[in-house]
Amino acid sequence: MTLLSEQVINKTKTDYNQRQGEVMFRLAKEELEKLGASITAKEIFQQPGLWQEAYQLYVSQLEAVESFLSGIKEKHDLIQVIFTGAGTSDFVGQRIANYLNQVNDLKHIRFSTVGSVELVGRPYDYLQADIPTILVSFARSGNSPESLAAVEIAKQLVDELYQVTITCAPEGKLAVAAEGDTDNLLLLQPAGSNDKGFAMTGSFSCMSLTALLVFSPASQEENAHWVETIIRLGQDVLDREDYVQDLVNLDFERVIYLGAGGFYGLAHEAQLKILELTAGKIATMYESPLGFRHGPKSFINNKTLVILFASNDAYTRQYDVDLLNEVHGDGIAERIVALSADKLAGTEAANFVLAEGGAGLPDVFLTFPYIIFAQTVSIMSAIKCKNLPDTPSPTGTVNRVVQGVIIHPLEK
């Protein structure tokens, strides 16, 4: 069993502790409190340490994870895994499902992703009675009405249903329901991932990491290497917050995030973060680089930031660079920035290059430092707009845990 190196563990703790006593996002803790941003800032900054904790929790439960999954695989030739969740929890599946289909044997296990809001509203589109299914529920609180209803509907419609519950709140209804259920594997996340702020930050990244570790066939040595690398890359992004602040200081009113494959799901989450934290004061959009030309490019004016999550895949990256060059050549957007693991060749667009070591990562692991960049853009933009990141909805009509949902009974 492979653990993270002591060097990585100690450096992560030191980096976080040093920043806690000084400044985050160029502001002292007291200033952040006055701006209503201290909780969210802390929860963004602590993520590399949380990834370390999430990995250690996974290792401590590895025997139970392997026993649970092997027991299911022995019973069935083909298993369907459905990732589900509401809001940001939905985007966990969008971020990881493609990768898991690439690295697993599709003759025996297949991955799909659908938001619990869709699963509840259109259950027959996604659930089949005669297909053995593992429903993987992602939830920060475990109390969202749609997440709870999705489980009950799946139980009602699927003959052989198993569950993996990945949640941040041990007292949440999903976690409580999983206790003592031999067909439901409960994987609680680090206590610090149960974000106290409005926005899901550490909860999103920790649940993503845990699901990757659980369902990837990679060796434990590979897992440890990849986790060590994302911790280092994530910390480096935080250390370069001045770059992000200079970007946010530009004159913009719109932001578009672009990404292909798992980065498309990440772009969905990134645009939601800035939309939430600025309470809509900044207009947002997400698209794929190839899809952007088919109408959504109309979104760009001279007060638009375009941020692209570039792929490590050489084939896909060609399309990333083509789009960057096209938008840069148009000369309309305020700024075009590409995030990449190594320097992008063949483009004059601005390029935020991760620290050394990212070039060898599968794309799905680049999503971890990339999302820290996007979260940083979001909190800085909220502060710039004079909105309160910790409680961003001035009217109170948008809540940390969704309210007002009526779940209607399903009649078979």
Stretches with model-predicted labels:
Residues 2-41, 48-53, 179-183, 305-306, ...:
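Phosphate-moiety recognition in structured ligand-binding domains
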Residues 29, 33, 40-43, 85, ...:
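Generic alpha-helical structural element
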Residues 37-40, 46, 83-99, 261, ...:
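Conserved phosphate/anionic-ligand binding catalytic regions in large, soluble enzymes, centered on
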Residues 42-43, 54-71, 76-77, 179-307, ...:
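Active-site phosphate/pyrophosphate-binding segments
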Residues 43, 50-53, 99, 153:
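Residue-level detector of alpha-helical secondary structure
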Residues 49-63, 106-114:
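Short coil-to-helix leader/linker segments, especially the first N-terminal amphipathic alpha-helix
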Residues 75-228, 309-348, 353-357:
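Glycine-rich phosphate-binding loops that contact phosphosugars or nucleotide phosphates
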